[in-house]
Structure formats: structure tokens, C-alpha cells
């Protein structure tokens, strides 16, 4: 088995998307390929077919490789709960909650497991494309490292270092990163990539030549800046308002927003414009208001209560505005949230917004499962996955929203008596073309706009991955990349 590792000078330089590109390129060239990231920190996660939890970046990379996502692609997932602690998920299951300091000391315990699991990939794939995290030059974290150079040494992987020129200072960041590494670590870096370049590459060439001379490492290529309709795990997606859009969908930007990839599929609707609500001042009058998931539901509810957004939501509801809550957002819409086991806070309970007649109790065990069903009385197919620690029960004024077909006798979500406020535990619900079409056509009808068929999100995503692969293939010296892996080229 051959392997290659993509490391970066910082977070958000494009490691994840370049790994996805390479996975698709290698697949196109006839190789069986697998993505791998030993440790991922993200509030965006995914549930596999067997009910295990993993990071979303490796899900996209798995699709690029033509694989069903599985937890061996991301054996450790860290989900921040506060600024100083996180939930540790190992091989798809909750390991515990740890402070940053305790986890730093805990990492070395995982190294043997990571090595053993990685070795199992040798018999399954021709190539493994490994993604690092942050920067290998975070020298304060070098001891017990299991995700950058520590992992590269553990599995003996050659490294390609990526820098983001769009932020400025790319030559300094590449040079500084290399210089801060130990000599044996520098030798692992076989090439560099400059990502997100705008303009004429000829202008860069003097700088590239000087950098290559200074660090004695070749540049494998310059990748241009481009926009794709693909999810971004590293930070909440940024929305560009569409000039001719007629439907305004607004999303509450919670401090601990999780699984914001839930709304990605709405971006592909031509007449839909998405925006974030960050304060009561920019609430506006949206056609649809989405309250997304949260890793700290109670904390985020207190946040929107304090800054006036909750009052705006209630005023919007009184005017028959359409509100859709997902997971934590669904819980916030209810009457009461109870936390008897102190899962999120020392508060025993907190009143919700009271817009849905439900009561939620946080449990100690997390629910992680794939689901499929249909909107009750509508026969609109729904699919997605659940990740939550709360169990919600109905009051007299709420009725179930979705009938779950793969869990007998179980209903999901709730709808108010007026039908304008609804919530669900199902992440990825808008990925399904049928459900997305149902919601957006409801808004179109309300505004007197012609109905449209929704495109299949998976088809759009696959086409965008192909486009990504074409851009990256044409930008990089693929012969050199194959060479550092000990491969002559296409099969």
C-alpha cells in the first residue's frame, strides 16, 4: 500500500478539500483509495450505516473515493463542548468528556490503536491519503502528536505541505513551518502546494524559486481560488446573496452551532438565498427561519435570549412566520429543557421558547442512528441521521412531524397547531430532494412563485467533486506526487 499525507501551515488552508481531490484523482486513475484522518476536531459529524459517529470532512473524502463512509477513516473525533473541554469519540462511540489538558496527556494512549488500525488498511487499498490537522509547527503540541508529524512517523508517510496564499504571507508561513520542524521531520516533506491563488501564476515564479532554494523542497503546483457547492467543515459556511433570489432563508448563527452542513443542500436551489442572523438587528423578515443544531443547547438558548434574538423569533412566530428547528434548535423551541445529569450545564432545567408543546430531558447516553421515514399525512420521503442526548415528549398542543419507518412505533419531531412551527432530530433532512422540494415549494406557493423540481443533491455533489479533481489535476505535478508514493502513474 502507498500513502501520502497532506499537512498545512495552518487550519483552513485547504487540506480537507485537497485530500478529497486526490482521492477522486487516484480513483479516476484506477486505484482503490481511502481517506484517513487520525484525529479530527469538529462540531460537524455524521452517522455511518452501523450507527457510528465520524467527522464530516472524511465523509466527503469517502464519497470522492467512491466509498461508503466508515469510522476507520476518522478513528478519533473531538467535539468541543466549551472553550476548554470536548467530547472525545473513539471509533465512533463516546469515550468521555475531557479537558484540553487531560486530552493532551491522553493522546499517547491512542497511538498503538492508530498504528494497528492503519496497518489493517494495507490489505484493503492501493493508496491511503492522510490529512493532518492545523499545523505541524505547533511545537507546543509536538509531544505525543498523533495527527501531524507524529502520525507521519508512526505510519512512515511522505508529506506534502500546503499553504494558503489568499490569506497573505504564504512564503513566510511555508518557510517558517519547515524551519520549526526537526531535521528528520523536514526530510519527510517532499513537496509544497500553494492553494487559493488569484491571478497570473507567472507573478509567483520568482517567489517560488527563492522558496525552493531556501528550504530545498520543490513546489508541486499552485491551485487557483475557486468556488464549489461542497460542504466546508472547518467553519460555518459563508453565504453569497443571489441577485435574482426570491426566497429568503435565514439561519440563526449560534455560538456552538453544530452540523451546519444540514443547510448546505439549500444552496443549490436557484431562487433561494441563505443568510445568517447574528443579532436582533439583522433578523429581517425571512420566508423561512432555521434554528440549527447546537453542541451546547442550553448555553446557546441563553445567548439568543440575552441578545434579543429570542424575542424576534417569537414576534416572527406570532406573524405566522415559518420556523424550522433541527436537533438543538428543535429542543429550544419547546416548553422546557431538563438536564438532570448535568450533561451540558449545572442548571437543572431551563424554560424553552414555548413555541412547540414539547418537553426535553437530556439523557446520559447519546442516540446515534440513521433514519428514514415520511412526513406524517404527506407521504413525503425523509432520510438522515440522529445525533442527540435529549429525549422529547409531546404535550397536548403538539403533534408528531415525521413517521420513522426503520424504528417501529417511533415518531420524530413536532408541529404546532398552526402548522408554521416544526422541529426534528434528523440531521441532513434537506439533502433529500423530495423533502427540500416540499418545503421550498410551500414557500413558493406562499409568495406566488412558480413551483420547481429540486435536483438530487448527491448528483450535484458528485459533479462538483469531479470538477474539483479536474482543477487540482491541472494545477499539480501529478507525476511528482505519484513518484513520492513510489508509483509510476496511472494503472
Swiss-Prot record:
Give me any GO biological process, just one: cobalamin biosynthetic process
Q: Where are the transmembrane segments?
A: none
User: What domain of life does the native source organism fall in?
Assistant: Bacteria
Q: Which family does it belong to?
A: Belongs to the CobB/CobQ family. CobQ subfamily.
Quick one: which pathway?
Cofactor biosynthesis; adenosylcobalamin biosynthesis
- UniProt keyword annotation of Ligase present: no
Write the gene name: cobQ
**Which ranges carry the GATase cobBQ-type domain?**
246-435
Pfam families for this protein: CbiA (PF01656), GATase_3 (PF07685)
What the entry lists under PANTHER family is as follows: COBYRIC ACID SYNTHASE (PTHR21343:SF1), DETHIOBIOTIN SYNTHETASE (PTHR21343)
Q: Which UniProt keywords apply?
A: Cobalamin biosynthesis, Glutamine amidotransferase
Q: What protein am I looking at?
A: Cobyric acid synthase
